[in-house]
């Protein structure tokens, strides 16, 4: 209340307005309207109380960030599409706030994750995560396997290189030089994905096992799957199946010490998605457009109160500065105000030191983006 009085008296001109609730998480009720309605009513009550003392300053109203499953206590961050999580309040000096950290696997990576931006492909709204697969078959060369052609179909428009083993027991499967070749309608061809596992930089996006056994590693120029009493599956990047093109997946593979019935294979797994983007910038722009559509439809201002990428994403050429530049380009081109998260903190900071220290060593790649994108600001 003291802050409200001081802002109303204009004694603290740095106060732009009041952020009501940061990233609100609400209990999940019987439907999304009831769930979001809880947050809307609370935000309205907060605003009404503020307006008893201050009618001049902005109130910043953030959409529902997540819903809590009350039976498990789990916060569900992606259960509902963004356009179902917005709401309006009755106030003529409100700004509607969103935060942006998409793709989270990039912006929130840990040391060693090595997630790059951009990737070859981004997916929005899976319709069928797994439709089927095609395995490479052994050729006349002892350890070399190659699949038949596969193409885009009505049931799938994506594929992912996959390494699979089953019932290895105490044995090991070795994989090397896994390659996807694209054959264009004009007769030309080229490699669109390759992994020789020499430096460990291209890691699987997902590791799955059916019974909790098995493990994988990269060493000596191989990817190795070891042990496992049932299926063990490593899935790499999702890639778009381009219309009119044909594809083959190939690579070297052998099993060592596997019991009878144990085997491994190289394959392509197929998925169906509503939207597939082959440009990181195109993907980011599409995701941001979904967020700001609420403002355009309701003629209210949108503000990105937070966006940022952690310190790891700026190392070793992973592309943190490219992601920030794309977000800032969208905001600048669409007249959206924004705040970068954060100024001074170890994980996301423009000055990424411990906050007990005076900020000295800034993120120079980030500083250059700020200077370039705000040169005319």
Where in this protein do the model-derived segments appear?
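Short, solvent-exposed loop/turn elements at domain surfaces
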Residues: 104-108, 202-207, 348-349
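Aromatic-rich peripheral "rim/lid" segments of glycoside hydrolase catalytic domains that contact
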Residues: 132-133, 179, 216, 272, ...
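Residue-level detector of anion-binding/catalytic polar loops
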Residues: 246, 301, 337
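Extracellular and organelle-lumenal recognition/adhesion modules and their flexible linkers in secreted
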Residues: 127-278
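Extracellular glycoside hydrolase catalytic/binding regions
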Residues: 9-14, 24-133, 141, 269-334, ...
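Short, solvent-exposed turn/loop segments enriched in Gly/Ser/Thr/Pro and often Arg
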Residues: 21-22, 63-65, 340-347
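Active-site beta->alpha N-cap acidic-glycine motif
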Residues: 1-3, 46
């Amino acid at each position: 209340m003291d802050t409200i009085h001081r802002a109303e008296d204009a004694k603290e001109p740095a106060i732009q307005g009041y952020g009501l609730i940061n990233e609100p998480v609400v209990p999940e009720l019987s439907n999304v309207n009831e769930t979001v309605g809880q947050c809307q009513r609370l935000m309205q009550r907060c605003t009404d109380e503020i307006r008893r003392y201050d009618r001049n300053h902005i109130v910043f109203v953030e959409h529902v960030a997540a819903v809590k499953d009350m039976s498990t206590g789990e916060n569900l961050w992606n259960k509902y599409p963004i356009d179902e999580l917005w709401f309006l309040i009755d106030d003529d000096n409100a700004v509607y706030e969103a935060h942006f950290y998409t793709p989270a696997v990039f912006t929130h990576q840990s040391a060693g994750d090595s997630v790059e931006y951009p990737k070859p492909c981004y997916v929005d709204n899976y319709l069928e995560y797994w439709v089927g697969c095609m395995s490479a078959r052994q050729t006349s060369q002892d350890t070399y396997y190659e699949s038949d052609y596969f193409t885009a179909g009505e049931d799938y428009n994506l594929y992912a290189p996959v390494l699979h083993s089953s019932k290895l027991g105490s044995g090991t499967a070795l994989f090397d030089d896994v390659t996807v070749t694209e054959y264009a309608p004009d007769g030309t061809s080229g490699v669109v994905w390759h992994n020789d596992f020499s430096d460990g930089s291209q890691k699987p996006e997902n590791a799955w096992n059916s019974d909790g056994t098995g493990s994988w590693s990269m060493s000596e120029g191989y990817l190795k799957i070891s042990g496992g009493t049932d299926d063990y599956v490593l899935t790499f990047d999702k890639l778009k199946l381009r219309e009119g093109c044909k594809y083959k997946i190939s690579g070297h593979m052998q099993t060592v010490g596997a019991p009878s019935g144990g085997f491994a294979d190289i394959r392509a797994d197929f998925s169906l998605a509503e939207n597939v983007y082959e440009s990181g910038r195109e993907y980011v722009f599409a995701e941001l457009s979904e967020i700001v559509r609420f403002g355009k439809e309701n003629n209210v201002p949108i503000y990105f109160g937070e966006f940022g990428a952690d310190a790891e994403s700026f190392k070793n050429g992973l592309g943190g500065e490219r992601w920030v530049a794309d977000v800032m380009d969208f905001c600048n081109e669409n007249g959206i105000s924004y705040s970068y998260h954060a100024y001074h903190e170890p994980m996301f900071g423009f000055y990424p030191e411990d906050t007990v220290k005076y900020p000295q060593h800034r993120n120079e790649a980030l500083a250059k983006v700020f200077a370039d994108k705000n040169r005319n600001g």
